[in-house]
Curated annotation (Swiss-Prot):
GO terms for molecular function: (3R)-hydroxyacyl-[acyl-carrier-protein] dehydratase activity. Its EC number is 4.2.1.59. This is 3-hydroxyacyl-[acyl-carrier-protein] dehydratase FabZ. It catalyses: a (3R)-hydroxyacyl-[ACP] = a (2E)-enoyl-[ACP] + H2O. The gene is fabZ. The lineage of its organism: Bacteria, Pseudomonadati, Pseudomonadota, Betaproteobacteria, Burkholderiales.
Length: 145
């Protein structure tokens, strides 16, 4: 899935769109996506100017965005202006290595279960096959007025 397809599914835009490409997707099971991290990311101006590090919460957000793409694929729906995909919870978040400019962040997200509109996922982020971050995520899709 390229960026044009991603933009049709996710409401996120610059500077918070954190999925550049979907490499693999198994509907109802898992997704593998990537984010190319560049020095042009706006968060590097303040985190940290002399030693730029991608904030851990943005790695979590990147996994949540990949999870949203998997959810839409699993349900066979596309979002509209009245559909919102909310991040509902996080458990067991661990950060194992810093991520910086020039890194390619690979997000692997697995759907653990889906019940009553609530999705639970296990996600990991890697750079060069090295674990950078891991967490369990909960998300929900809602219709808004």
């Amino acid at each position: 899935m390229d960026i044009h397809q991603i933009l049709k599914l996710l409401p996120h835009r610059y500077p918070i769109l954190l999925v550049d490409r979907v490499l693999e997707i198994e509907t109802g099971k898992r997704i593998k996506a990537l984010k190319n991290v560049t020095i042009n990311e706006p968060f590097f101006m303040g985190h940290f100017p002399k030693h730029p590090v991608m904030p851990g919460v943005l790695m979590i957000e990147a996994m949540a965005q990949a999870a949203a793409l998997l959810s839409f694929s699993t349900l066979g729906v596309t979002p509209d202006d009245k559909t919102v995909y909310y991040f509902a919870g996080i458990d067991g978040a661990r950060f194992k290595r810093p991520v910086g400019p020039g890194d390619q962040l690979i997000m692997d997200v697995e759907l653990l279960r889906m019940k009553a509109g609530i999705f639970k996922f296990k996600g990991v982020c890697r750079v060069d096959e090295n674990l950078a971050c891991e967490a369990e995520l909960m998300c929900t899709m809602r219709t808004v007025a």
